[in-house]
Swiss-Prot record:
Name under which the protein is recorded: C-X-C motif chemokine 6
Keyword list, A-Z: Antibiotic, Antimicrobial, Chemotaxis, Cytokine, Disulfide bond, Heparin-binding, Secreted, Signal
Location, primary (coarse class): secreted
Record carries keyword Signal: yes
CDD domains named among the record's database cross-references: Chemokine_CXC (cd00273)
Source organism phylogeny: Eukaryota, Metazoa, Chordata, Craniata, Vertebrata
PROSITE patterns in the cross-refs: SMALL_CYTOKINES_CXC
Signal peptide: 1-36
Amino acid sequence: MSLLPSRAARVPGPSSSLCALLALLLLTPPGPLVSAGPVAAAVRELRCMCLTVTPGIHPKMISSLQVFAVGPQCSKVEVVPTLKNKKEVCLDPEAPLIKKFIQKTLDSGNKKN
């Protein structure tokens, strides 16, 4: 019996099954991430959308308005209108004109129902 290792002893390094798994992961296309489409657009990132705010926009330039409440992704209310030229901007939710516009929008929505 010899104390020297035999030639068939394992050489330290990644195992063949680990290499096969890594190769499989690298060759697998990220299907759900690519094919998510509109669903992925609806999911917000885990950060505030509005890093800077625009002080005000004339209400006639706004085609739609989204108001995002405080949540785990952001500690402040975010007001994001889509303008008629399809651009999205962030408005200051504390501005008096914006508060008035949001209230008017909510009131007109209640009258329609």
